[in-house]
């Protein structure tokens, strides 16, 4: 082990990154500066909200920077003055250009929430669930100009259970990811970690989830719809259009269950005298365990339809 600790500049923005940063600090990693995205308004408020990474940096009294464009030439001298050994990037939220990737003395490394080369891109956790994967993980890699294509240093896998949501999987990946990242930083402190080239022929991509991606199409299979609901819970949330007493409204669906049942009329409400709503899909039925009608609180679908007759409610099919 060298006498001088390696100097690290940490780049990150959301809660996932904040938890990783705090873990590194608790384990005596010398973080000399923190870079996070600018504060933005959240929800209906116009007041900017501090990023989770900013809050951790402030609580540890670390130098904090929130440039509008991190790769701007004006900001480069600020980073260069720290003479950092490592740049560590975790869910920062912006592409980092080559002149910054070349700046640290040792490397610029990234914690990516998939088993690369699968699910390169902005939404690897959500996409892995939506695609019905049974396994995913984290990869610590060298950063290069091409997105998520650098040499891999360490990979750790985790199982995706049948009911696991995006939020739950994110926490599981954070736990294994922060330990893997700390181990890699220690490897750099001892020398040069081994690296493995990615096979680009095996690469798949995980583009950002848009709101329209989250609309349920009842013509699709029940399993696919169930996976979509899990993959966007809690954010941005799966949804569909319904008509309640003839008025069209948006229904958010956060928990479901696949029900074996022959289906030939997608979007039809399955006759049931009690319990949660069950909707026919392209192949089976989907039980709506937890729903939220626009303007209302989250509840079970049984609670939502209590006192409502079947002809008062209709699910709209694309």
From Swiss-Prot:
InterPro entries, per the entry: Fmt (IPR005794), Formyl_trans_C (IPR005793), Formyl_trans_C_sf (IPR037022), Formyl_transf_N (IPR002376), Formyl_transf_N_sf (IPR036477), Formyl_transferase-like_C_sf (IPR011034), Met-tRNA-FMT_C (IPR044135), Met-tRNA-FMT_N (IPR041711)
EC main group: transferase
Domain of life: Bacteria
Alphabetic keyword roster: Protein biosynthesis, Transferase
Pfam family, one: Formyl_trans_C
One MF term in the entry's GO annotations: methionyl-tRNA formyltransferase activity
Protein name: Methionyl-tRNA formyltransferase
Organism for this UniProt entry: Protochlamydia amoebophila (strain UWE25)
